[in-house]
UniProtKB/Swiss-Prot annotation:
Catalyzes the reduction of hydroxylamine to form NH(3) and H(2)O. This is Hydroxylamine reductase. Belongs to the HCP family. Keywords: 4Fe-4S, Cytoplasm, Iron, Iron-sulfur, Metal-binding, Oxidoreductase. It comes from Thermotoga petrophila (strain ATCC BAA-488 / DSM 13995 / JCM 10881 / RKU-1). Its main location: cytoplasm. The keyword Heme does not apply. [4Fe-4S] cluster binds at C5, C8, C17, C23. One of its GO terms (molecular function) is hydroxylamine reductase activity.
Length: 431
């Protein structure tokens, strides 16, 4: 099947065009339109969360209108223009991430490094999953002074880095890892669960009656909370058995904001010039429950000790329990936050380039990314729009990429797919 399009009444056989569009749309144009729609979805997620906090950008809204309109039937048949739209989507996603970062910092303060407990505290519990810091804050306000303790899950882990959230004493730790462990995790712990955004799964019957959604998230058979009154969530938590006091087997470090890392720039420069840091790698992204994604942990474990790894998004959970140590006080594993905090990794790279007096593309920097869904598509186009090279992606290429699109991505943008950890390390470090 070369393409699939069934958005108009002319769809072949009444089911969909699979070889060529009845309208004249080529398979490559159809796939590039799909790519653009996916990127728009990713931008919309970040833009939505920024607007929840009262931050807006009409330029982003204008782009979303135009770009989505361009995919309507009989509007645009030009493949090159859709490549340009994709790059513009990358630039707009950059604006959206900048806007959301601004919203988060002005609302909750700039993150600072913190160690997060992975065990449980004696008392009642609520697990918060998703990405929505506003929902978490409102819940924390409402459980103050009670024995109902709040635990983050997956992409909510970076919340602990924000001073304005960390100040709440009922925010006590993080349970679980990436989004796909939730059915097992939520069954294991007798707690109330609040799903705040994407990355929620249809629940099993073992916990459906103690799960709630809020904001954009909704699940069949699960009570949805409109607004931010979480009384029902808290009462459900109170009705459940206490969690026992149980220390975690390790702690997780997060909260490395742009300012924190940039404050170390002179020391980093000194270590690079002394040959004690030889390469920086961004290893992270959206994780998936594939055996293939064991690659990322093995990759980091096999890196030489003269490397520094920046991680982000739920892909961090493949590696963030590893003790990589430090290089004269510079941590070898730096967690900069959620997937939208790709902007932090970008700003760090730009700051280091300025310190060394070079372009970002001249830094000893490689990106090794895992992708899962549409937000990752938007982020990839952001990186490509910035002209970044040395990007490895896995576990698989997006299904919308055909040979023509792959040629553009590899020839013009230098995109590569992951192979085997040792092979890729040798290629990256040229050893």
């Amino acid at each position: 099947m070369q393409m699939f399009c069934y958005q108009c009444s002319q769809a072949a056989n009444g089911t969909g065009c699979t070889e060529y569009g009845v309208c004249g749309k080529s398979p490559t144009v159809a796939r590039l339109q799909d790519n653009l729609v996916f990127a728009i979805k990713g931008i919309s997620a970040y833009y939505y969360h920024a607007r929840e906090l009262g931050y807006d950008d009409p330029e982003i809204a204008g782009f979303l209108d135009e770009a989505l309109y361009s995919t309507l039937t009989n509007v645009n048949f030009d493949a090159q223009s859709f490549v340009e739209y994709a790059l513009e989507a990358g630039r707009m996603n950059l604006r959206a991430m900048q806007l959301l970062k601004k919203a988060h910092i002005e609302t909750y303060g700039e993150p600072t490094p913190v160690e997060v407990e992975t065990g449980t505290k004696k008392g009642k519990g609520i697990i918060v999953t998703g990405h929505n810091l506003k929902a978490l804050e409102e819940l924390l306000k409402q459980v103050e002074g009670t024995n109902v303790y709040v635990y983050t899950h997956s992409e909510m882990l970076p919340a602990h880095g924000y001073p304005g959230l960390r100040k709440y004493k009922n925010l006590v730790g993080n349970l679980g890892k990436a989004w796909y462990d939730q059915r097992k995790l939520f069954t294991e712990y007798p707690v109330a669960i609040l799903g705040t955004s994407n990355c929620v799964l249809i629940p099993s019957e073992s916990y459906r009656d103690r799960m709630f959604t809020t904001s954009i998230a909704r699940l069949p058979g699960v009570k949805h909370i409109d607004g931010y009154d979480y009384t029902e969530v808290i009462e459900k938590a109170k009705s459940l058995p206490d969690l026992e006091e149980k220390p975690g087997s390790y702690k997780l470090r997060t909260g490395f904001s742009t300012s924190v890392v940039v404050s170390l720039a002179d020391k980093i420069k000194e270590l690079v010039e002394a040959g004690k840091i030889k390469h920086f790698l961004v290893v992270g992204g959206c994780d998936v429950p594939f055996k293939r994604n064991e690659y990322y942990r093995e990759f980091v474990q096999k890196l030489p000790k003269e490397t520094v790894v920046i991680t982000l998004a739920c892909g961090k959970f493949r590696i963030n329990d590893l003790d990589l140590g430090d290089i004269e006080g510079i941590p070898r594993l730096i967690d900069v936050g959620q997937c939208n905090d790709t902007i932090v990794a970008i700003e760090i790279a730009q700051a280091l380039a300025k310190v060394f007096g070079v372009e970002v593309t001249d830094l000893p920097l490689t990106l090794v990314l895992t992708w899962m869904e549409q937000k990752a598509v938007a982020i990839l186009w952001t990186l490509l729009a910035l002209g970044l090279k040395n990007i490895y992606v896995g576990p698989v290429l997006p299904a919308w990429v055909n040979e023509d699109i792959l040629k553009v991505l590899t020839a013009e943008f230098g995109l590569k797919t992951i192979s085997e950890p040792e092979k890729d390390i040798k290629e990256i470090l040229k050893v």
